[in-house]
Regions:
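Hydrophobic ligand-binding cavity/cleft-lining segments
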Residues: 4-57
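Generic detector of N-terminal low-structure segments
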Residues: 6-9, 77, 119, 149
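Short, surface-exposed coil-to-beta transition loops
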Residues: 17-18, 72-76, 98-101
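Beta-strand/loop substructures that line and gate deep hydrophobic ligand-binding cavities in soluble
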Residues: 91-142
Length: 152
């Protein structure tokens, strides 16, 4: 019974990544950088390709290719866009059972803001998690830093 309860708890708790940074750039500048999906391969470590599949003023569907240590995967998200404030991501396709999260940009002044990045995810199976989990966690954990460096 304890193993069963433990198993249920493992199923409920998804891996999470949360990062926050205070940066000397406006919320608008940081929002524009994060929303510029097509530029990701130029500065995001491990990102080998990106493309916008569909775009409207309040929503974007985009695919991102990531690769590290010989492991390559593509995932697609539908992003709800609130201009200069937030980008909320939901999984459309990829090696995940679940992937939800987003970015929040809070102005501190005209020339500074707080960036918050949060991601909850679960891979489709243990084999994919073993092969790709560490790579994805490392890439996702470094995203705030990569965008902050890009802003300079």
């Amino acid at each position: 019974m304890i193993l069963f309860v433990g198993f249920l708890l493992m199923e409920i708790v998804m891996p999470q990544i949360s990062r926050t940074a205070l940066v000397p750039y406006s919320a608008e500048q940081m929002y524009q950088l994060v929303n510029d999906v097509q530029s990701y391969p130029q500065f995001l470590p491990g990102c080998t390709g990106s493309r916008i599949l569909e775009s409207t003023p309040g929503q974007m569907t985009a695919a991102v290719d990531v690769s590290k240590a010989g492991i390559s995967k593509t995932f697609t998200t539908r992003n709800q866009l609130t201009s200069n404030q937030s980008i909320l991501m939901n999984l459309v396709d990829g090696p995940f059972k679940k992937l939800i999260g987003g970015w929040k940009f809070t102005p501190l002044s005209q020339e500074a803001c707080r960036i918050e990045f949060h991601l909850d995810f679960e891979f489709t199976n243990k084999l994919i998690e073993l092969a790709f989990g560490r790579v994805f966690k490392e890439l996702a954990a470094n995203m705030v830093q990569a965008f902050t460096v890009r802003a300079k």
